[in-house]
């Protein structure tokens, strides 16, 4: 335990609730300048108004959203699929959630008997999963459970066995690459433009460009002041906001966001949540992968928890 050993620790962080009983002193930075310094006790005693005025994230743990579905759950809900392998799936949703999902089953993505493996190690074994249009579905679970792998399958970057339908029609992986857009956890793999503004317009024909819309999106994501800078020169949080803004510029049917709140403060977390909600309200299929309970509370409609599979092939 570094704290108990007397070591000097410096933690640069937006997520604060887990730092109770760890930090002794708090320094607030703005524009590269120290704007406030205080004992940690003063931070934890702040009112909600003072906290949000300072742009700080939640000081106490957010009540977790309960999953409506648990995939790969090792319990009596296990059942055999047609191939004889175990499909561990437990539905713990309320009746209202079940009824709502059933009315939307024909609209959106439906995965059936989906299986994916790395060599002899099976990562995904999903008898059925519905990802409806017009709602934000959150995938949660421990590292290594297969969340990011599933998102790559959804947008056609990985091929899996089984059937994936969009609005009742089977769509193969090649077609899904055209219909889907993914914001990866490692945003550096998605930054290609020479300037921030250019990043938002890559791949969009000039006849379809709307400069006013580009300006609005830059403003919404707090990127106007860095519009002429190279994307790789931005801070981690600015890069995260840029790839989310780029997703907002394209017109796709399936949007996947892998840890989209990484490096975001209170204001920018909520602007990102607003963007995600806007896409859902535009009747798109929207999926987020996150460990961030604040983001879930801000934009998720329901939660699917993925447990790691324990069996190999």
Cite the ranges covered by each PLM segment.
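Conserved ABC transporter NBD signature motif
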Residues: 162-176
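Conserved ABC ATPase "signature" region
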Residues: 209-226
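Helix-to-loop junction immediately C-terminal to a conserved catalytic motif
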Residues: 155
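H-loop/switch region of ABC-family ATPase nucleotide-binding domains
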Residues: 13-14, 290-291
